[in-house]
Amino acid sequence: HAVLLSLIIAGFWLMDSLKDPVLARIVGIEYQPIAKVISVLTTLVITCVYDFLTSQLSKANLFHLVSVVFGVVFMIISALLADPDGGLRSSDAPGPHRLLGWVAYVSIECYGSLMVALFWSFTNSVMNLEEAMGAYGLIISIAQFGAIAGSTLATNSKSIGISVLFLAGALSIFSVSLVVKVYHVVFRRKLRSAYAALQTESEFSRERERAT
C-alpha cells in the first residue's frame, strides 16, 4: 500500500509542480483563477461518473481504468507539449484560445483528487481496523518519499524538459495499475476474504433496511 501511494503521490507532485508554469506559458497566468474554477467543476462531474462506476466495477478494475485513462491523457499532453508548433516552444503568444494549457491544468487537478480517493477506498476495503491502526501511519510516512521524488524531479524541469517530465508522470500512473495487479496476485486469498466480508455486510444492510 505504501508503494502504491508513493507512486500516486510522486506522479501527482511531479505534474502539480508543473501545471502553473505550463498554464503561464501557453494560456497566461492571469487565467489561473478561471482554470481553478473549471477544475472544480470538472472534478465534480468526474466524481459523479466515478460514483456510478464504483457500483459496476471492483476496486482493482477501477484502478486499472483510471490509471489507463489518465496515463494515456498525460502521454498525449507530453507529446503535444513537445510539438514545436503548438507546444511550449511555439512562437504563438499565450492566450485562452490555446486549449492545451487548460487541458493539462484540469487533468492534473482531476487526477490528484480522484486517484487519492480511490487509493483510500481500496485500502479501507482490504484492511480491518487493527491492520489500519498499525499501517496507516507507516503508509503515509513512506508516501512522503514519493512526494519528495516528484517535486525534486520538477525542480530540474529546465534540464530534463517539461514534456519529458509529463511522460515520466504518465509512466508512474501506468505503474500504479501494475502494482495493483501484483498486489492482487500476491494477496489473492486475503482480498477474496475481504470482498466476501464486504458483500456479506452489504447483504445484511439490505435485509435490515427491508425489515425496517
Name what the model sees in each region:
Residues 18-19, 111-128:
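Intracellular juxtamembrane helix-capping segments at the cytosolic ends
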Residues 43-63, 127-132:
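Transmembrane-helix boundary and interhelical linker motifs in polytopic inner-membrane proteins
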Residues 1-24, 102-110, 212:
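Pair of pore-lining "gating" transmembrane helices in MFS-fold secondary transporters
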Residues 21-37:
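Juxtamembrane extramembrane loops of integral membrane proteins
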Residues 2, 29, 33, 56-61, ...:
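Intracellular loop-helix junctions on the cytosolic face of multi-pass helical membrane proteins
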Residues 9, 16, 35-53, 116-121:
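Central hydrophobic cores of alpha-helical transmembrane segments in multi-pass inner-membrane proteins
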Residues 32-48, 133-158:
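Glycine-rich segments within core transmembrane alpha-helices of 12-TM secondary carriers
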